[in-house]
Design a protein with these regions (language model features):
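Cys/His-rich microdomains that often coordinate metals
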Residues: 348-353, 390
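Glycine-rich phosphate/diphosphate-binding loop of Rossmann-like nucleotide-binding domains
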Residues: 62-75, 158-238, 380
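Rossmann-like adenosine-cofactor binding region
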Residues: 213-290
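Short, flexible, mixed-charge glycine/proline-rich loop motifs
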Residues: 329-341, 360-378
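Short cysteine-rich clusters marking metal-coordination/redox-active sites
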Residues: 342-344, 383-386
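Adenosine-phosphate binding glycine-rich loop
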Residues: 273-274, 279-327
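Phosphate/diphosphate ligand-binding glycine-rich loop within oxidoreductases
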Residues: 44, 50-157, 284-287
Length: 398
C-alpha cells in the first residue's frame, strides 16, 4: 500500500476541528486522512503511544455498538490516550431526563475530544456546535457515518490500488443505511463509473441523495436484484436490513432476509477481482461459507478501522503536524448565512427533540432550468443538523 500514495503531496490541508459528515469533506482532506492512517501503521507501537499521551477521549454512545466503540477506544489507547466512556444510557443522567445538550456541555469539560453516536439524525452536528472541543461523528441515526466511510475507502484503496472509476453495488437497506449515504457521497470525489442501488422500493436511496448524485454528474441505476449487475461490479457493498430503524415492525417483517449471498450465488458469477464489503454486524445476509473466499474483505475492513480512526483523532486534535510540512489551523465553524424560524419535518432530527433554534441552508436552483414564475415554489432547503433536503411548501414555521 505504501506506493499508492507516492504522488500525494501532504500539506496539512485537513481542517482541524470536527469530522461530522462526508458532505463537509473535500477530496484532498479525505486522501490526507487515508495517507496519515498509512503512516501511522508504519510507526512502531512504542512511538504510537506518544502521539496522544495525556489526552482524554470521551466516547458517548447513546445506542448499541460493538465494532465502532471498541475500535475507537482501542485506537485511542494504542496512541497513549485515556478513555472516558459513557455508561449504558439506563445508568446515566440521560435516564433522569438530562438533555443531550447538557450532557455534551458537561462532557466537554472532562475531555479533549468527544466521539459521539446517537440514534437521532444531526446529533453529532449539534454536539459540534455546543462543544469547544473537537467532535467526531460515530454515526447519527440514518444520516452519516464518516469513520466507517473512511475505513471503507482505505480498504478499497489498499485492495484496488485506486479509488477512481470504480463500479460499486450497494445492496440492502439503502433508506436507513448511514454507511451507504456517507460512502456514496464520498465516492463522488473519485469519478465512479456507475453506482448500482439494489433494494426493494421501500428501502431505496432517499431522493435527496439521488438528486445530489445527479447534480454531481454521477451515473447510477436503481435495481431490485443484485444479479442484474453482479458480473460488472468491482465492489459489492452489502448491508443488513436494520430492524431498529423501522417505525413499524410489520414493515421490517416484509423485507427481512430479502437479500442473502453465499458461495452458490457469488462464486463463478462475479468478476474474479470483485470484493465484498460489509459495515457489520451481519445477521443472515452473508452466509459464513463466503468468509474464507478471496472476495470476502469485511473482517479486514473492520480491522482497518484502527489506523483510520487513529488518523481521524490525531487530525482533529492537531497532532498530525509531524507528518505534514506545515501546521494545521483549528477551524470549528463556517461562515454561512442560515435561515431560521422554520421547523424540520424529519421526526428523527435532533432539532425536534432538543430545545434549540433550527437552521436551514437555502439550496440555490439552476435558474436556467426553472420557470421563473415557479422559482419560489421550487425552492429547497437543507436542515443544518440532519442534512435532509425539503421543499419550501413542506416547511413549517416555528
Amino acid at each position: 500500500m505504501r506506493k499508492l500514495f507516492e504522488n500525494i503531496q501532504l500539506r496539512g490541508e485537513i481542517a482541524v476541528g470536527n469530522i461530522i459528515s462526508m458532505n463537509d469533506m473535500k477530496k484532498k482532506e479525505i486522501l490526507d486522512i487515508l495517507e496519515l492512517a498509512r503512516k501511522i501503521e508504519d510507526c512502531s507501537e512504542e512511538k504510537k503511544l506518544k502521539f496522544l499521551h495525556g489526552k482524554i477521549i470521551a466516547t458517548l454512545f447513546f445506542e448499541p455498538s460493538t465494532r465502532t466503540k471498541m475500535s475507537f477506544e482501542s485506537a485511542a489507547m494504542r496512541l497513549g490516550a485515556n478513555i472516558l466512556s459513557l455508561p449504558p444510557v439506563e445508568q446515566s443522567s440521560v435516564q433522569k431526563g438530562e438533555s443531550f445538550t447538557d450532557t455534551i456541555k458537561m462532557v466537554e469539560s472532562y475531555s479533549d475530544l468527544i466521539v459521539v453516536r446517537h440514534p437521532l439524525d444531526g446529533a453529532a452536528k449539534l454536539a459540534s456546535e455546543i462543544s469547544k472541543k473537537p467532535v467526531i461523528n460515530a454515526g447519527d441515526g440514518s444520516n452519516q457515518h464518516p469513520s466507517q466511510t473512511l475505513l471503507d475507502l482505505y480498504t478499497i484503496l489498499d485492495e484496488k490500488g485506486t479509488l477512481e472509476n470504480l463500479k460499486i453495488a450497494f445492496v440492502g437497506d439503502l433508506k436507513y443505511g448511514r454507511t451507504v449515504h456517507s460512502l456514496a457521497k464520498a465516492l463522488t470525489h473519485f469519478n465512479p463509473s456507475v453506482m448500482y442501488f439494489v433494494a426493494p422500493q421501500s428501502l431505496q436511496m432517499p431522493e435527496y441523495l439521488l438528486e445530489d448524485l445527479k447534480k454531481n454528474g454521477i451515473k447510477y441505476e436503481i435495481l431490485e436484484d443484485f444479479r442484474d449487475c453482479l458480473d460488472k461490479i468491482d465492489i459489492f457493498y452489502m448491508t443488513r436490513i436494520q430492524k431498529e430503524r423501522f417505525p413499524d415492525i410489520k414493515d421490517y417483517e416484509k423485507v427481512k432476509g430479502i437479500y442473502v449471498i453465499n458461495r452458490e450465488n457469488i462464486v463463478g458469477k462475479c468478476k474474479e477481482d470483485m470484493i465484498i464489503l460489509h459495515p457489520l454486524p451481519r445477521v443472515d445476509e452473508i452466509e459464513t461459507d463466503l468468509d474464507d473466499t478471496k472476495y470476502a474483505l469485511y473482517f479486514k475492513q473492520a480491522k482497518n478501522g484502527i489506523p483510520v480512526r487513529q488518523s481521524m483523532m490525531m487530525t482533529v486534535l492537531g497532532k498530525n503536524k509531524e507528518f505534514f510540512d506545515q501546521d494545521t489551523e483549528y477551524k470549528n465553524s463556517q461562515n454561512i448565512n442560515y435561515i431560521k424560524n422554520m421547523k424540520c419535518n424529519n421526526s428523527k432530527c435532533i432539532s425536534n427533540h432538543e430545545n434549540i433554534e433550527v437552521k436551514f441552508i437555502h439550496i440555490k436552483e439552476d435558474s436556467e432550468n426553472l420557470n421563473k414564475n415557479n422559482l419560489k415554489k421550487k425552492s429547497k432547503y437543507k436542515c443544518f443538523y440532519c442534512e435532509k433536503v425539503i421543499l419550501e411548501d413542506e416547511i413549517k414555521i416555528q
